[in-house]
Amino acid sequence: MDASAPLTAVVAFVHVAEHASFTRAADALGVSTSALSQSVRALEARMGVRLLQRTTRRVGLTEHGARFLLRVRGGLDQIDQAFAELDSARSVPA
């Protein structure tokens, strides 16, 4: 996979993984369940692997999904930290 996977799809995947539910993740993100599902499916298609194991009752991580989550969660945390630092710097007079 190239590095051009949409960040929104990665964020969608992380939310589904953390909530273990498309419905709860969609509610947390303020998007429809179908839009969230399409985003994750597109990410899986782009990567060529299944990230999530879906059943009628729950959503779990595949082995690939668990490894991917560990890697991207740290990256997303760094992005959040960068925004927080910029917000702090902006509120301090120069």
Model-derived regions: residue spans:
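Hydrophobic two-helix hairpin corresponding to the core of helix-turn-helix DNA-binding domains
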Residues: 10-13, 25, 62
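Short helix-boundary/capping micro-motifs
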Residues: 15-30
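Helix-turn-helix DNA-binding elements, focusing on the entry/boundary residues of the two helices
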Residues: 21-22, 40, 54
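Alpha-helical residues within the helix-turn-helix
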Residues: 27, 38, 45, 66
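Residues within the DNA-recognition helix of helix-turn-helix
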Residues: 32-42
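A short LG(V/I)-centered, amphipathic sequence patch enriched
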Residues: 44-61
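Interdomain hinge and pocket-entrance segments immediately C-terminal to HTH DNA-binding domains
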Residues: 88-94
